[in-house]
């Protein structure tokens, strides 16, 4: 049986270009990715720090805490490019605010004169787009969504590509619980998918309606949250 790999991915960078595309004149310094198959974390992860060949901006340092000194002995992107590409090849990539990370990764590939873009050999799902459909008008950062879904993020003092990938993986499973078939292996048709998804979660008038649980349902929900806190690696509805 050919089981499709889902890779949850995040990056940290030297900073963000405020006047052009975010990746212009900046580089990736960390890649974190976790593998999910059959809605289970497999433990087959990819994590690397990268020497960017330029200094880290102070604003970015405050976000992720990764220093120039720490990166001095780390590999450059060229040294890890092939292993990274082999890891994500033909997978479904799940990324929060995908255009940001994809822009940085494609720039790194362009610097190496590789005539490829990751969206040509991976399907890409943007969880920010999913969140905006589910919660229009709400704050939909990773931090805000973890709070909304009661995902424990007490260990997330600073941004970390590998930690954030794991949190995003748990979040993605919860947001799409029981809805794997909504997403095509080759292309993501958000318009049609979210027509189905909105119907399934009873969205009306483009706003999220709160359906109050019965006492029994609430008790089951509390037991389910406790189950999650016990660090189960698989999530089902």
From Swiss-Prot:
Q: What is the species of this protein?
A: Buchnera aphidicola subsp. Acyrthosiphon pisum (strain APS)
Q: Which reaction does it catalyse?
A: DNA(n) + a 2'-deoxyribonucleoside 5'-triphosphate = DNA(n+1) + diphosphate
**InterPro entries according to UniProt:** DnaQ, DnaQ_proteo, Exonuclease_RNaseT/DNA_pol3, RNaseH-like_sf, RNaseH_sf
Q: Which cysteines are joined by disulfide bonds?
A: none
Q: Which GO terms describe its cellular component?
A: cytosol
Q: Which UniProt keywords apply?
A: DNA replication, DNA-directed DNA polymerase, Exonuclease, Hydrolase, Magnesium, Manganese, Metal-binding, Nuclease, Nucleotidyltransferase, Transferase
Q: Which residues bind a divalent metal cation 1?
A: 10, 12, 164
What does the record list as GO biological process? DNA replication proofreading
Subunit structure, as described in the record: The DNA polymerase holoenzyme is a complex that contains 10 different types of subunits. These subunits are organized into 3 functionally essential subassemblies: the pol III core, the beta sliding clamp processivity factor and the clamp-loading complex. The pol III core (subunits alpha,epsilon and theta) contains the polymerase and the 3'-5' exonuclease proofreading activities. The polymerase is tethered to the template via the sliding clamp processivity factor.
**Protein name, per record:** DNA polymerase III subunit epsilon
Which EC numbers characterise this protein's activity in its record? 2.7.7.7
Residues the record lists as binding substrate: 10, 12, 64, 164
**What SMART domains is this protein classified in?**
EXOIII (SM00479)
Free-text remark on how the cofactor is bound: Binds 2 divalent metal cations. Magnesium or manganese.
Q: Which domain of life is it from?
A: Bacteria
Question: Which residue positions are annotated as catalytic?
Answer: 159
Binding of a divalent metal cation 2 occurs at 10
Q: Name one GO molecular function term.
A: DNA binding
Q: Which cofactor does it need?
A: Mg(2+); Mn(2+)
Function, as annotated, reads: DNA polymerase III is a complex, multichain enzyme responsible for most of the replicative synthesis in bacteria. The epsilon subunit contain the editing function and is a proofreading 3'-5' exonuclease.
Report if keyword Hydrolase is assigned. yes
Q: Which CDD domains match?
A: DNA_pol_III_epsilon_Ecoli_like
